[in-house]
Amino acid sequence: MCLDDFTHTRRDILKLSAMLTAAGALPMLASLQARAAAEPDAPVRIGYLPITDATPLLVAHNNGLFEAEGIKAERPVLLRSWAQVIEAFISGQVNVIHLLSPMTVWARYGSKVPAKVVAWNHVGGSGLTVAPGIREVKQLGGQSVAIPFWYSIHNVVVQQLFRDNGLQPVTRPVNSPLAANEVNLVVMPPSDMPPALATQRIAGYIVAEPFNALAEDLKVGRVQRFTGDMWRNHACCVVFMHEHDLNNRPEWSQKVVNAIVKAQLWTRDNREQAAKLLAKDGDNRYTPHSSQVLQRVLAPAATERTGYENDGAIQHANWDEQRIDFQPYPFPSYTEALVTRLKHTLIQGDNAFLADLDPAHVAQDLVDDRFVKNSIASVGGLKAFGLPESFTRTEEFGF
């Protein structure tokens, strides 16, 4: 990563931190209100990052599922950073996004963005990738590990993993001296992580796919643990929509969620085809990734799973987790556990608002599940996604 890229990254991080404050969001919220008034029947406008987290949104567009529901959808907008995603969403340039689940907590309660989670976009789909010579988590002591953002499931999970292995997460300037039991967390764009690992600027990173698969493909890193093997069937990115659409356009909102739920179901049954349509040589060129790397995530060979079990990347084989999977229901127990863990996670910047959050209240207030429940029922219930017919569950951890 060149200096200009690094400066741009820091600028994006600072910009995102400024936007997700009540004062910083005000100008964009004014723009959102103006756009809503000027275009009350706006089409589906998706904003996304080129990661497999976005799969259902892109499949829904590619397969014409929005049109099949009777609503118009523009070509999804490829964005380059979470700062761009948030800015486009808060200002109303896009109206359907996938967003890191902890970022939705920050957006709604830290900056008062009037938006809600309407569904999960996927489960799992992330991993901790380390340098080839590292075989144990404890070996990361005294080194730096990259995360995509402070408000991410990656940050929450990796800090617990470190503590369980006798390591202390810290946040220090680059090249600062570290104690043998300290791990320095640095925020880095996913696309910069494999090169940084290859040049030994970092000892590892935890991030969404396909950047773990890419490190394997380039032979610059190995997967130490999959996040879904530490927090069973955890949400990573969720579907976030504006409250004014949910309240003023409920039929439209229902059709949006219907299309996304059907896209998830289609992807579960057509994993290889999904990898091809997302690839850089697909008709819509949604991502810059090769079909080979995406296949490794969406449709891995059975022999790869055996290798991960032998290496310890998978330690709970009985959970039968996919590398990435898809089910749309936002279980309240997950949101409660997430908020509880965020309170005890090292987060750089102003996070005082977390102290006053009641996990049970957030689970009810942040999420609007009326649409996704209807959508799930229309495709055969939760059993269509391989789940018991219950909208409650118990969170399972295995760090």
Where are these predicted regions, by residue range?
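Pocket-lining segment of extracytoplasmic ligand-binding domains
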Residues: 101-103, 190-299
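N-terminal secretory signal peptides
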Residues: 1-12, 21-23, 27, 32
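Conserved C-terminal helix/tail region of periplasmic/extracytoplasmic solute-binding proteins
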Residues: 335-399
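Short, glycine-/small- and polar/acidic-enriched structural segments
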Residues: 37-188, 196-216, 220-233, 369, ...
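Secondary-structure end/capping motifs
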Residues: 249-357
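Short, locally clustered residues in the helix-turn-helix/winged-helix DNA-binding domain
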Residues: 18
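Short helix-capping/linker segments at secondary-structure and domain boundaries
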Residues: 25-28, 64-67, 167-169, 344-354
